[in-house]
Amino acid sequence: MQHLPAPIHHARDAVQLPVAIDYPAALALRQMSMVHDELPKYLLAPEVSALLHYVPDLRRKMLLATLWNTGARINEALALTRGDFSLTPPYPFVQLATLKQRTEKAARTAGRMPAGQQTHRLVPLSDSWYVSQLQTMVATLKIPMERRNKRTGRTEKARIWEVTDRTVRTWIGEAVAAAAADGVTFSVPVTPHTFRHSYAMHMLYAGIPLKVLQSLMGHKSISSTEVYTKVFALDVAARHRVQFSMPESDAVTMLKNRHA
């Protein structure tokens, strides 16, 4: 059984990557970063696309694609409704409420803290395939804007994915197993949060400024975002190909001439 990067490496001249990177070099740099347990574990774009290939169910595939295209935390993605998406050209986007802010809203509902303005972040949806597939899913599965809560009897905004975090982990596990059965394996463990890390690294490879990425990720502190640059710095340094050596005899001649 071979790892996914091997066949892609051999076919790299014929494959168009979504972001222009030296894929074999990026793989090598990721393997280097995995030595440090504190650094994020992420997949590269070809690996994510390959994983999605093994998710035939449209609803499941689009949840994982949403994590990949938005960098959302799993609870943020599971809270999404149709109204959170604006798919109108030329700038489709999704509105996400961050983990901390959603927790505060729940606390206010329980009467434990005063109400305040709930902050959301807007994440552009720049991938046309993703937007098209999302529209197809909504139309095909007839996902409603609202539905009646059977427990309370109230009409509420309908969540697109009425599942739990554990269910999503099961979906991912099934996809990884299906890939392995087909001879495709992944170098890092895949969890819902892996897609968030993968989004961040993909955006850095695409040249997105760090402060912009901080906003897209919903990080309160820039230090949370800077962890990705610790990995990305390896790529930057490698691409510059900084040399340290020169012919020793030439160096000696230079120094002698300096004193001539």
Curated annotation (Swiss-Prot):
Active site: 73, 105, 193, 196, 219, 228
Record has Transcription as a keyword: yes
All copies of domain Tyr recombinase, residue ranges: 38-241
Pfam families on file: Phage_integrase
An example Gene Ontology molecular-function term: DNA binding
Keyword tags: DNA integration, DNA recombination, Plasmid, Repressor, Transcription, Transcription regulation
GO biological process: DNA integration; DNA recombination
KW Lipid biosynthesis (keyword) present: no
The family this protein is said to belong to: Belongs to the 'phage' integrase family.
Stated role: This resolvase acts at the RfsF equivalent resolution sequence of pColBM-CL139.
Protein name: Resolvase
